[in-house]
From Swiss-Prot:
Keyword Chaperone in record: no
Record localization: Cytoplasm
UniProt-listed GO biological process terms: protoporphyrinogen IX biosynthetic process
PANTHER family in the cross-refs: GLUTAMATE-1-SEMIALDEHYDE 2,1-AMINOMUTASE, GLUTAMATE-1-SEMIALDEHYDE 2,1-AMINOMUTASE 1, CHLOROPLASTIC-RELATED
This protein's UniProt keywords: Cytoplasm, Isomerase, Porphyrin biosynthesis, Pyridoxal phosphate
The organism of origin for this protein: Thioalkalivibrio sulfidiphilus (strain HL-EbGR7)
Name assigned to this protein: Glutamate-1-semialdehyde 2,1-aminomutase
Pathway: Porphyrin-containing compound metabolism; protoporphyrin-IX biosynthesis; 5-aminolevulinate from L-glutamyl-tRNA(Glu): step 2/2
Amino acid sequence: MTRSHDLFKAAQRHIPGGVNSPVRAFKGVGGDPVFIQRAEGAYMYDADGKRYIDYVGSWGPMIAGHAHPEVVEAVREAARGGLSFGAPTEIEIRMAERVCELVPSMDMVRMVSSGTEATMSAIRLARGFTGRDKIIKFEGCYHGHGDSLLVKAGSGALTLGVPSSPGVPAALAEHTLTLTYNDLDEVRETLAHVGGQVACIIVEPVAGNMNCIPPVPGFLEGLRELCDEYGALLIFDEVMTGFRVALGGAQAHYGVKPDLTTLGKIIGGGMPVGAFGGRREVMEQLAPLGPVYQAGTLSGNPVAMAAGLKTLEIISRPGFYDELTRKTRVMVDGVLTAAGEAGIPMTANQVGGMFGLFFSEQPVTNFYQATQCDLDRFRLFFHEMLERGVYLAPSAYEAGFVSSAHSEADLAETIEAAARSLREVSGN
């Protein structure tokens, strides 16, 4: 037995399911979760001291690697001045200025403490600004665990939303319409019927919660045009893609400007931070300027702002994203080659330092196609890679991430581990 096994048993006595976020429980792959003791650079070390090359990166934030010395020092310096004040600080201004500089669609920004809080607040703001109640989201896109967003599709595009979790009132779910990602015709048809009631369309510009699925050409542009036509706000959930696929986020990468943007993960440099922002006339509806209420005790926490600002400084350095994209492509291409040599069908998607591997013969562009991939092979592959010291997301529906800390040797070791793992999975 491992120490992780013992810790998981102990955790289940006082923590529901033994984890504080469900995907960590390894339900999607089976077995006991790995309990992490520490991390540095591209590596994590479990409670037994085993080293893993990490492609989860705390689900995205660790773009510069774990415990980056400059980020750690920024946190130490900020902490010496106090952990939290519940009052305005200068560092909040610096963070807001930098975010608005990097993401030109954001005239103003409000800091919060998580991505979920950012999306919940952005939707409330969109409803308050437009005076409408309905929202459109897409199947397979995850926007946090707010009640309005834990809704699945009904039996057809125009049906009312259905709660996907107990505790979500049906009356609230009715206002959420869940459509097919990358299907602009379905959006157009829906808006033709209820467009005057829709406050916003919220979308992950690159879906990262049905693995990694980029938008098909014209999809984001079409959403922008339809929102303009029907007077709805377009919200880009860039909690995952913000500062990950490009310095200006997916909106810069694809050249589409939303009305509101939600951010998280990288903006906190590993600390719990979220943000939402956008057009000035929309953001000015927020209290204390306007009637839409939003607040938070730890919003703009000075230690978290210090970590985030230093991370933004690091990723703004020349060549950062070119190198990150190159490294990701080297790793993905190497794994695909290994799959081909093992006779295992596999496709992949990549945008910048974000990637997805699918056990499928066909390209994957939406949630249904993602569910048709070979989940049993993924589970076997995951555990083979874990045994060989490569830590992938413990779910076939989660994107992977490369950091600037991954070395050429790390990439080569990963590709070799994949080749051995895929041969084992294939039985050859």
